[in-house]
Amino acid sequence: MTELPDNTRWQLWIVAFGFFMQSLDTTIVNTALPSMAKSLGESPLHMHMVVVSYVLTVAVMLPASGWLADKIGVRNIFFAAIVLFTLGSLFCALSGTLNQLVLARVLQGVGGAMMVPVGRLTVMKIVPRTQYMAAMTFVTLPGQIGPLLGPALGGVLVEYASWHWIFLINIPVGIVGAMATFMLMPNYTIETRRFDLPGFLLLAIGMAVLTLALDGSKSMGISPWTLAGLAAGGAAAILLYLFHAKKNSGALFSLRLFRTPTFSLGLLGSFAGRIGSGMLPFMTPVFLQIGLGFSPFHAGLMMIPMVLGSMGMKRIVVQIVNRFGYRRVLVATTLGLALVSLLFMSVALLGWYYLLPLVLLLQGMVNSARFSSMNTLTLKDLPDTLASSGNSLLSMIMQLSMSIGVTIAGMLLGMFGQQHIGIDSSATHHVFMYTWLCMAVIIALPAIIFARVPNDTQQNMVISRRKRSL
């Protein structure tokens, strides 16, 4: 990094700020959801759509981001991503209804989907390969700080200003970032193959319609017959994509990926695993505020140990997998996360609040070990010709499963709560207790998939793939 010219350093700073904006926004909103519900006159049971709309949009748009950057240029797309993200933030702050807020979050998600993958591509183009790892470490560090600051910052802004400021703070940062991108970043383009628009549309329709069908009865009052039609339509779109990919060599994601057994198992396990774990960052601050009566600031502070545990575990997870193997680590962390989530609920309902930071620290550590192991398992055996496509598909599945997880969590709250939730009441405690029991079962189920994973303990497998991903 010391030998890089000044203009390259500035370009890395621009990418780093983009990573920070995107990662901050994934966690800062969760703490503010109860306050948003009160301000908008909505039930807290409907507020999960604020999270789902953003994460699902990111999942849908991810496959197109790399192609757009190659075709139109990394500067143009990164500039557009920051502008869209900033405009989305402004519209979020100006929203007067839940529907307006959800639409604004969709616009924000379009920008967020392009920001991180295009940022990675930019680093690859402006930095020599010998310094690529150091450069990626530099630009991704703010992305790790964002989730740490997000809950606490969101709590401070909600408690001492209003929820609108969690979006307004993005505007000055976005303006500076857009100007710096336009002036300092080179606009690299390369020859691209034809974009698989039919495949992209089939996947986008399938993901969006299936998620809507999962949640429509509670949030939108859609009739059961309409929901059944939506579910059938979404499933048909996914099946049509599989048929399309089988016949088309230039498909968005080649079916040759699934000839690698560890990729198939890892992708299926990642999808199922992140549905369960994706519920926790959404449900925890909601429960702390609505179930236990914590202030937004206090609830935000309580989330910090979980992020610290996650960051700390990344330093030793490679050695753990090398020692015990993928199967043992994945099964143990999956079951362990389910048990820790039940421990959190038990400690909270017993009133032992002083133990909550320790439990959340443990939850972050277990979750991080599982995430890192799942990612490595999924990609480690792919041939180089398919590695980029496999990584893109994994990124899309990660976002999709998180949106499904939040949707299911909201559905469970609605089912047990029946629209009647009050602050720190006995009935509310029962609602969250039943919801957490269901969540624990959902979190534990992927252990069945991971039990089929080969228990590979070769030392170079994890470490070499970890380096390659950076």
Swiss-Prot record:
- Fetch the CDD domains from UniProt: MFS_LmrB_MDR_like
**Membrane: is it a keyword of this entry?**
yes
Cellular-component GO terms for this entry:
plasma membrane
Instruction: Identify the residue ranges that face the Periplasmic compartment according to the record.
Output: 1-11, 70-76, 125-137, 186-196, 246-262, 307-341, 417-430
A Gene Ontology MF term for this entry? Answer: transmembrane transporter activity
UniProt keyword annotation of Transcription present: no
Coiled-coil positions are none
| Alphabetically ordered keywords of this record | Cell inner membrane, Cell membrane, Membrane, Transmembrane, Transmembrane helix, Transport
InterPro entries listed in its UniProt record: MFS, MFS_dom, MFS_trans_sf, Multi-R_MdtD
The residue spans the entry assigns to the Cytoplasmic side of the membrane are as follows 33-48, 98-101, 159-164, 218-224, 284-285, 363-395, 452-470
Could you identify this protein by its name?
Answer: Putative multidrug resistance protein MdtD
Span-the-membrane segments of this chain are 12-32, 49-69, 77-97, 102-124, 138-158, 165-185, 197-217, 225-245, 263-283, 286-306, 342-362, 396-416, 431-451
Give the subcellular location. Cell inner membrane
Q: Name one Pfam family in it.
A: MFS_1
Q: What is its main location?
A: membrane
